[in-house]
């Protein structure tokens, strides 16, 4: 993943909406910066990192997202997780790279269930 593709999303503490951007840690909390001078404090427990992939609709796929994967009449639903020991994203129990993202659709995330 290129450095310019490293981005995060988290739930804005004030509005409850999800925002994307750069992650900033300050003494008074965690922030997402969307623009050079515009940042918002976020719920640190909801911070998710971008996988570098998009689904078939062009929606960015983040850690914690719930996706539906369809291939050859089979459908599988699962969440995207990070395994620090393998340094890889997982879909269910398998490496994410084994599943073409153009066969996936983001349907939500584990924090909104």
For the regions a language model picked out, list residue spans one by one:
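Secondary-structure transition motif
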Residues: 1-113
């Amino acid at each position: 993943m290129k450095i310019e593709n490293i981005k995060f999303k988290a739930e804005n503490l004030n509005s409850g909406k999800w925002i994307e951007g750069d992650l900033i840690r300050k003494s008074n909390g965690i922030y997402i910066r969307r623009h050079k001078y515009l940042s918002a404090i976020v719920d640190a427990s909801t911070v998710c990192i971008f996988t570098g992939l998009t689904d078939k609709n062009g929606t960015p796929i983040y850690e914690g997202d719930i996706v539906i994967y369809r291939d050859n009449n089979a459908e599988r639903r699962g969440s995207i997780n990070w395994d620090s020991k393998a340094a890889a994203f997982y879909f269910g129990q398998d490496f994410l790279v084994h599943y073409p993202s153009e066969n996936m659709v983001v349907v939500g995330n584990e924090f909104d269930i």
